[in-house]
UniProtKB/Swiss-Prot annotation:
Residues 168-169 are annotated as: Important for autoinhibitory function. Belongs to the SNF7 family. The record marks R214 as: Interaction with STAMBP. Keywords: Coiled coil, Cytoplasm, Endosome, Lipoprotein, Membrane, Myristate, Protein transport, Transport. The gene is chmp3. InterPro entries: Snf7_fam. Probable core component of the endosomal sorting required for transport complex III (ESCRT-III). ESCRT-III components are thought to multimerize to form a flat lattice on the perimeter membrane of the endosome. Several assembly forms of ESCRT-III may exist that interact and act sequentially. GO terms for biological process: endosome transport via multivesicular body sorting pathway; late endosome to vacuole transport; protein transport. It is a lipid-anchor. This is Charged multivesicular body protein 3. A lipid is attached at G2 (N-myristoyl glycine).
C-alpha cells in the first residue's frame, strides 16, 4: 500500500515477467492434456481392432467417432499453444520497447491471441485474469467473445465426421473396413471367436462406456 491507502502500481517489467511465467505454466497444463488424450486415443484404436475381429461394426463406428472428437480436441490444444507462443514473443518485444520508451505499448497481436485463448475451457480462468491485467496496463482493449464459435465447430464436425471416421477405420483395421477415403460400406470380416462372444457383449459395452467417459472428461 502507498500513501493515503492507495495501492502502488507495479513496475511494467514485473507485470510482463509475471504474465510470461503464468503463460508458460498454462502451456505445461496443455502439454499434459495433449499427452493424456493421445494415450487414451491409442487405447481406443486397440479397442477398434478388437471389435473388428469380433465382427462388431457398430462398436467400431462408435469408437472411431471418439477418435475423431479427440483429434479435434488435440488440434485445438495445439492451436492454443501457438497462440501462447505468440503472446510470449510479444512479451519479449514489450520488454525491449520498455527499455527504450519506459512504457508498455498496445498490441493487436496480443489482442487476437488472447481472444482465442479465453475460449479454451482448460485455461479460461487464467486467461481471463491475464486479459484484465493487460487491459488495465493498456496492452489490449476490452474483448468481445465470439458466441458463434461453437455453432461453427458443430457444422464443421457434421460435414467432415463421416469421411474422417471412414479414414480412421480403414487405417486402424489395416483396410479391413472399406477403402480410404471412400465411404465405408463393406461388412466386417467374420468373427475369429464365436464361443464366448455372447457372454462378453455386456462387458464390451461397459468398456465402451468407460472409455467414452474418460475421453469426455479429458476433453472437458
Amino acid at each position: 500500500m502507498g500513501l493515503f491507502g492507495k495501492t502502488q502500481e507495479r513496475p511494467p517489467k514485473d507485470l510482463v515477467n509475471e504474465w510470461s511465467l503464468k503463460i508458460r505454466k498454462e502451456m505445461r497444463v496443455i502439454d499434459r492434456q495433449i499427452r493424456d488424450i493421445q494415450r487414451e486415443q491409442e487405447k481406443v484404436k486397440r479397442s477398434i481392432k478388437e471389435s473388428a475381429k469380433k465382427g462388431n461394426r457398430e462398436a467400431c463406428v462408435i469408437l472411431a467417432k471418439e477418435v475423431v472428437q479427440s483429434k479435434k480436441a488435440v488440434n485445438k490444444l495445439y492451436a492454443s499453444k501457438a497462440h501462447m507462443n505468440s503472446v510470449l514473443m510479444s512479451m519479449k518485444n514489450q520488454l525491449a520497447v520498455l527499455r527504450v520508451s519506459g512504457s508498455l505499448q498496445k498490441s493487436t497481436e496480443v489482442m487476437k491471441a488472447m481472444q482465442n485463448l479465453v475460449k479454451l475451457p482448460e485455461i479460461q480462468a487464467t486467461m481471463r485474469e491475464l486479459s484484465k491485467e493487460m487491459m488495465k496496463a493498456g496492452i489490449i482493449e476490452e474483448m468481445l467473445e465470439d458466441t458463434f464459435e461453437g455453432m461453427e465447430d458443430q457444422d464443421e464436425m457434421e460435414e467432415q465426421a463421416e469421411m474422417e471416421i471412414d479414414r480412421i477405420l480403414f487405417e486402424v483395421t489395416a483396410g479391413a473396413l472399406g477403402k480410404a477415403p471412400s465411404k465405408v460400406t463393406d461388412a466386417l470380416p467374420e468373427p475369429e471367436i464365436t464361443g464366448a462372444m455372447a457372454a462378453s457383449d455386456e462387458e464390451e459395452e461397459e468398456d465402451l462406456e468407460a472409455m467414452h467417459s474418460r475421453l469426455a472428461a479429458l476433453r472437458s
